[in-house]
Amino acid sequence: MAKKSIIARNEKRKKLVEKYAAKREELLKAGDYEALRKLPRDSSATRVKNRCVLTGRGRGVYEKFGLCRQMFRKFALEGKLPGVKKASW
């Protein structure tokens, strides 16, 4: 499981991205790169990491489900993910 501080930092970044999204879009269209540079660094969407909602793991995360590969496999085998079943051919 990821450290709670890492998860909290990512959540803070998500809030900042949401807060400044409209302003950032406006400045990009106007081409005002100087004002864009003065915005908080963490307000950029590229700074947000997709993390597993259960474990906080940052690698191997299925964006559609919000789960890392280990949790995805566990829940899929237990039948807790509707519409997901093990492939066989």
Curated annotation (Swiss-Prot):
GO molecular function terms attached to this record: rRNA binding; structural constituent of ribosome
Signal peptide (residue range): none
One Pfam match: Ribosomal_S14
GO BP of this protein: translation
InterPro entries recorded: Ribosomal_uS14, Ribosomal_uS14_bac/plastid, Ribosomal_uS14_CS, Ribosomal_uS14_sf
Cellular component terms (Gene Ontology): cytoplasm; small ribosomal subunit
Keywords: Ribonucleoprotein, Ribosomal protein, RNA-binding, rRNA-binding
Complex formation: Part of the 30S ribosomal subunit. Contacts proteins S3 and S10.
Its biological purpose: Binds 16S rRNA, required for the assembly of 30S particles and may also be responsible for determining the conformation of the 16S rRNA at the A site.
Family to which the UniProt record says this protein belongs: Belongs to the universal ribosomal protein uS14 family.
Protein name per Swiss-Prot or TrEMBL: Small ribosomal subunit protein uS14
Organism: Chlorobium limicola (strain DSM 245 / NBRC 103803 / 6330)
